[in-house]
């Protein structure tokens, strides 16, 4: 049986703390999973947000700063992993090279939306700026599920023709009929079900993994 480590939404942006990502990397070293899945929204990309465009909070945001902040956060996560891999090589111990999978989230997809809205940006900005492949990640498009050990991973799973996210882990199992893990929402949620052949299914909303408070959250969220 393989071991999976899931990193939910990290939403790195300029000025926010990232030391918890190094802790997560050290946790990966301690547990040595076979697969590491980042469920997306690692880059918050506030400079491309349409949510508060035109407000005072929007002033001073820069695309390049957003990209660099996310890269620094990812490097913090990967630093302990790379150090452990080099240690194993030096000591001639059993190698550990986990499969690393990144499912693009709606925040990363802001880059694509910006290009679609302004074709002059085509070739100037793009997912290549994230350098995910260079850092060793397999990258899957926004909402493209990747199936690993009979578990479907995606930034979120949709319900109905409108493409809106499912509202609960239980509904996710009812809609997709297989084990699924998603991020996107702040809440954690878990559900279990069993197929007619006795196969167990797991539905998981993985929650979030950042230290800061988002402005759009209320005291009840």
How would you name each of these model-derived features?
Residues 1-75, 82:
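N-terminal active-site segment of His-dependent metallophosphoesterases
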Residues 8-11, 40-43, 106-108, 156-158, ...:
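Active-site metal-binding loops of divalent metal-dependent hydrolases
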Residues 16-17, 46-50, 111-116, 164-165, ...:
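A short acidic (Asp/Glu
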Residues 109-112, 121-130, 151-156, 160-170:
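Core alpha/beta structural scaffold of self-assembling particle/tube/pore-forming proteins
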Residues 154-221:
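Conserved beta-sheet core of the metallophosphoesterase superfamily
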């Amino acid at each position: 049986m393989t071991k999976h480590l899931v990193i939910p939404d990290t939403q790195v942006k300029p000025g926010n703390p990232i030391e918890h990502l190094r802790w997560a990397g050290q946790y990966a070293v301690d547990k040595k999973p076979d697969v590491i899945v980042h469920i997306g929204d690692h880059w918050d990309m506030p400079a491309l947000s349409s949510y508060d465009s035109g407000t005072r909070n929007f002033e001073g945001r820069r695309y390049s700063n957003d990209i660099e902040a996310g890269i620094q956060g990812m490097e913090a996560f990967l630093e302990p992993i790379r150090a452990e891999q080099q240690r194993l090589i030096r000591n001639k111990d059993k190698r550990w090279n986990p499969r690393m999978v990144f499912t693009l989230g709606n925040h990363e997809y802001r880059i694509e939306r910006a290009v679609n809205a302004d074709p002059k940006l085509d070739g100037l900005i793009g997912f290549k700026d994230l350098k995910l492949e260079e850092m060793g990640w397999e990258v899957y498009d926004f909402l493209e599920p990747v199936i690993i050990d009979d578990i479907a991973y995606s930034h979120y799973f949709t319900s109905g023709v409108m493409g809106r996210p499912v509202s609960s882990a239980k509904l996710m199992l009812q809609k997709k009929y297989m084990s699924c893990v998603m991020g996107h929402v702040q809440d954690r949620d878990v559900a279990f079900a069993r197929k007619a052949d006795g196969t167990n299914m797991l539905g998981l909303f993985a929650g979030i993994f950042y230290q800061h408070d988002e402005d759009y959250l209320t005291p009840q969220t």
